[in-house]
Amino acid sequence: MKIKHMPAKKSRLSKAQRDFLDTYFEVNPHPNTQERAYIASQSLVSEEKIRNWFQNRRTRERGDCKIASHRSAFSVNTFEENTSSVHPTSNDLYIRR
């Protein structure tokens, strides 16, 4: 009979750690190796977790930009569709018999 090992419990960052990382991300979203080592020592988080956090945050940032641009394009199209019936075009000014 094989004994299955339970995976290690995933540790979460504290609010203070997230705030520190968010602040650093605003200044530099691409920290180099030395900067990641500094961040890890200041936040008491492993360098690997810091590297992953920045990678995930950049991905999330790109995804948020795509969603925002899609929403703004959608709202402009919706606005144009809704206002076309309110404002007649030049062709609508001619009465066809």
UniProtKB/Swiss-Prot annotation:
Pfam families: Homeodomain. Coiled coil: none annotated. It comes from the Eukaryota. The keyword Lipid metabolism does not apply. GO terms for molecular function: DNA-binding transcription factor activity, RNA polymerase II-specific; RNA polymerase II transcription regulatory region sequence-specific DNA binding. Keywords: DNA-binding, Homeobox, Nucleus. PROSITE patterns: HOMEOBOX_1, HOMEOBOX_2. Residues 6-65 bind DNA. GO terms for cellular component: nucleus. Its main location: nucleus. The keyword Nucleus applies. It is found in: Nucleus. CDD domains: homeodomain. InterPro entries: HD, Homeobox_CS, Homeobox_regulator, Homeodomain-like_sf. This is Homeobox protein HD-9. It comes from Encephalitozoon cuniculi (strain GB-M1). The lineage of its organism: Eukaryota, Fungi, Fungi incertae sedis, Microsporidia, Unikaryonidae. The gene is HD-9.
